[in-house]
């Protein structure tokens, strides 16, 4: 019994939490652009200043701790391609092909993104349990601000006309 511990999973703020904390951005586009990492709201940091350093630190430190990735530039490309596929059915073969990596590597890299709470897979909802297990999930990011940064979106106004909006 000695050494028991509690594990907390701290995700970005929810819309409800931002509303109750009175830090909700003035528009939906602004909320999507800024994302929901507490640091941005706590220190009033510009997302364009925060996310590039977050990505750099994440890739250089956290990813290397989780798995030895030889070519970090390919991993960053993979991360950006994942951001471009938010809300779409997961196609690891396509991701692997576009990055020039094996499907096994793409699968392993996705597990890194899931383990570090960057991405999650939304499983399909079917009454038939077997269908839920075999149907293709959709890919999502926990934080929209991070995804915007990876997609080189520079301000909330760009979201209005961005080809991935929806």
Protein language model regions, located:
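Short, hinge-like loop/turn segments at secondary-structure boundaries
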Residues: 1-4, 25-26, 139
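Accessory nucleic acid-recognition modules appended to NTPase machines
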Residues: 45-166
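Conserved AAA+ ATPase small/helical "lid" subdomain
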Residues: 28-56
